[in-house]
């Protein structure tokens, strides 16, 4: 049995409530895993745990020391990478997410770094 991968990839998220809410919403949308940069807030922060409403116990997660390399590895495995970006031409609802996908979300104040956002196949708003 082959499982479709729908990954959420977070870069330097700082607010515990935001991480928890993103994880909870992601689970509702069908993500199969969460990848976070090492400088993302601790997923075991009590505010994160509370705001996930249990999603933290159901969605596999991974912290990486090198998020850029991790994204390159995903792309090498045929995973299509989308980035939430203000310069995106299409609304996220207009894209086709069939097949293995990863969705990049950046820091609350600064968004994605330029280098990571340029690694995406598609920018969406």
Named regions from a protein language model:
Residues 1-125:
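Post-transcriptional modification and biogenesis factors for structured RNAs
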């Amino acid at each position: 049995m082959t499982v479709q991968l729908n990954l959420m990839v977070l870069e330097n998220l700082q607010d515990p409530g935001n991480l928890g809410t993103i994880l909870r919403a992601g689970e509702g949308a069908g993500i199969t895993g969460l990848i976070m940069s090492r400088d993302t807030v601790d997923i075991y922060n009590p505010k994160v745990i509370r705001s996930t409403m249990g999603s933290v116990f159901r969605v596999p997660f991974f912290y990486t020391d090198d998020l850029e390399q991790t994204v390159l590895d995903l792309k090498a495995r045929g995973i299509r990478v989308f980035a939430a970006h203000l310069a995106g031409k299409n609304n996220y609802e207009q894209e086709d997410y069939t097949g293995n996908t990863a969705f990049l979300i950046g820091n609350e104040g600064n968004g994605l770094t330029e280098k990571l956002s340029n690694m995406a196949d598609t920018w969406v708003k």
